[in-house]
């Protein structure tokens, strides 16, 4: 019968049992009575080092003698109220009515300028001509035609009796004198620009382009000629370029580290089917190269790889594309070698970075051909004619063609050739009958009876006309009696038909 294991009581219940006279467990008693090793060390070093009210001990944390206080609280007192912000008082100066200045009728009509004049106190007196605070001359101009009449400026009234005619001397009112400021340093420069191309009346402006004449500049050259420099602006090659301060985030960029072996690959199977570089297998047309490949490798067995660079490879990642500094496209794969194997079956090995740079696509070069010689052709461009080509009449007069230049020479050569006559025979096959050339002279070889050798008799190619040759034997007809066929269909035997009568 198996005994059931009972769970131990809590430390609080065990300590209460100890106080009531029960069994006292040493670790529980020392914890509640603060007699552990940590408490003894605090009591010994407490006289030498003061830790404050930190409450360090084996008991529960109480937060010191004053307990914990929430963060951000201002204490148990009354929170301070915000002081009111008062706007400073602005001294208001009262403005009363201005005093009325009486005008004497006998005073001068020229009113001196007191208010409204320009303030030139801030300008230095030695600032230069036209800029400093020099004395400005003041001139007063009066119109002599209107400067007549009384002092008061009103009309003169004459009183008469009722029977007499009233004569009123109407005088024009006095005008205010004009005051002008005159500055001797003020100069006005009028610039007039004449541009003949802005005239709307000129509608047929012809421009003649001739590379044999150089341009002329009218007036002073106000432009400064400086050597130009190439600014070498760099434009992004991608639609979303990566910032210079951005870290390495792509797997292809993280593969360039000192803890990873770099291995360039030139085999074309690295792009189509990289598994053929690790193990011997047949070519699979349905293989997807954009996947990760896992290989079953036994560390204890020795297996050769088709490519020595992929020996002991247990894992190949999917391809990653990146750009090199030369502007080429680089295909990268991360491989893991199976070197060590633990007891649990975990395979450990270094990582290798395999990469292959794709060649750049060169631009197509198209060979251009010259259609005509334009050495003596001039071009005139104007508003009405787009392009007009004119030839020099003097050059045309010097060109003379003879009749021999106009003949088209035949490049065919019929030397050592003969005529062939073709025909079709009874069976429908084509038969070619060559006709020998008459100009070819025949050579006859006669065997020498003597023992001195073989002599050839060369006939003369020149034919000498001779007289009529009379044969010594009379001609007689020749009948062919040995022919084995007859051309007349009558002589062909007929085949008899056999009729069966039922």
UniProtKB/Swiss-Prot annotation:
Intracellular or extracellular location(s): Virion; Host nucleus; Host early endosome; Host Golgi apparatus
Taxonomic source organism: Human papillomavirus type 48
Family, as annotated: Belongs to the papillomaviridae L2 protein family.
Disulfide bond as UniProt keyword: yes
Subunit field text: Interacts with major capsid protein L1. Interacts with E2; this interaction inhibits E2 transcriptional activity but not the DNA replication function E2. Interacts with host GADD45GIP1. Interacts with host HSPA8; this interaction is required for L2 nuclear translocation. Interacts with host importins KPNB2 and KPNB3. Forms a complex with importin alpha2-beta1 heterodimers via interaction with the importin alpha2 adapter. Interacts with host DYNLT1; this interaction is essential for virus intracellular transport during entry.
GO molecular function terms listed in the Swiss-Prot or TrEMBL record: DNA binding; structural molecule activity
Intervals of motif Nuclear localization signal: 1-9, 493-501
Official protein name in the record: Minor capsid protein L2
Keyword Membrane recorded: no
PTM annotation: Highly phosphorylated.
Disulfide bridge map: 18-24
InterPro entries per UniProt: Late_L2 (IPR000784)
Coiled coil (UniProt feature): none
UniProtKB keywords: Capsid protein, Cytoplasmic inwards viral transport, Disulfide bond, DNA-binding, Host endosome, Host Golgi apparatus, Host nucleus, Host-virus interaction, Late protein, Microtubular inwards viral transport, Phosphoprotein, Viral penetration into host nucleus, Virion, Virus entry into host cell
One GO term (biological process): symbiont entry into host cell
GO cellular component: host cell; host cell endosome; host cell Golgi apparatus; host cell nucleus; viral capsid
């Amino acid at each position: 019968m198996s005994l059931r294991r009972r769970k131990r009581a809590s430390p609080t219940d065990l300590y209460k049992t100890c106080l009531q006279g029960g069994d006292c467990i040493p670790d529980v008693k020392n914890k509640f009575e603060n007699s552990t090793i940590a408490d003894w060390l605090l009591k010994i070093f407490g006289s030498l080092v003061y830790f404050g009210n930190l409450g360090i001990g084996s008991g529960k944390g109480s937060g010191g003698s004053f307990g914990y206080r929430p963060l951000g609280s201002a204490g148990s007192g009354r929170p301070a109220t915000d002081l009111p912000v008062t706007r400073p008082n602005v001294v208001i100066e009262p403005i009363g009515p201005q005093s009325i200045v009486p005008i004497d009728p006998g005073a001068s009509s020229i009113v001196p300028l007191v208010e409204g004049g320009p303030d030139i106190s801030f300008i230095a007196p030695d600032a230069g001509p036209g800029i400093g605070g020099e004395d400005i001359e003041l001139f007063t101009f009066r119109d002599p035609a209107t400067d007549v009449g009384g002092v008061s400026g009103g009309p003169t009234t004459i009183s008469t009796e009722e029977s007499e005619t009233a004569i009123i001397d109407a005088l024009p009112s006095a005008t205010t004198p004009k005051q002008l400021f005159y500055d001797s340093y003020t100069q006005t420069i009028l610039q007039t620009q004449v541009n003949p191309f802005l005239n709307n009346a000129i509608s047929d402006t012809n421009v003649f382009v001739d590379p044999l004449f150089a341009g002329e500049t009218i007036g002073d050259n106000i432009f400064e000629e400086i050597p130009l420099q190439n600014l070498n602006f760099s434009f992004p090659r991608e639609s979303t370029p990566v910032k210079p301060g951005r870290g390495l985030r792509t797997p292809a960029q993280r593969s360039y580290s000192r803890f990873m072996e770099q291995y360039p690959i030139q085999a074309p199977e690295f792009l189509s089917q990289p598994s053929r570089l690790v193990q011997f297998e047949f070519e699979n047309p349905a293989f997807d190269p954009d996947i990760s490949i896992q290989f079953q490798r036994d560390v204890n067995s020795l297996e050769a790889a088709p490519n020595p660079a992929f020996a002991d490879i247990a894992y190949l990642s999917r391809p990653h594309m990146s750009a090199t500094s030369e502007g080429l496209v680089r295909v990268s794969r991360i491989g893991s070698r199976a070197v060590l194997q633990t007891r649990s079956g975990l395979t450990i090995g270094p990582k290798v970075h395999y990469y292959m740079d794709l060649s750049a696509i060169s631009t197509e070069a198209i060979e251009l051909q010259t259609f005509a010689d334009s050495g003596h052709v001039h071009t005139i461009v104007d508003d009405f004619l787009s392009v007009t080509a004119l030839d020099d009449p003097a050059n045309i007069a010097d060109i003379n063609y003879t009749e021999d230049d106009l003949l088209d020479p035949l490049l065919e050569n019929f030397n050592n050739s003969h005529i062939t006559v073709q025909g079709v025979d009874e069976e429908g096959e084509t038969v070619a009958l060559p006709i020998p050339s008459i100009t070819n002279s025949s050579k006859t070889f006669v065997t020498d009876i003597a023992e001195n050798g073989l002599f050839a008799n060369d006939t003369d190619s020149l034919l000498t006309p001779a007289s009529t040759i009379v044969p010594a034997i009379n001609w007689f007809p020749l009948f062919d009696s040995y022919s084995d066929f007859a051309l007349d269909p009558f002589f062909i035997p007929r085949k008899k038909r056999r009729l069966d009568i039922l």
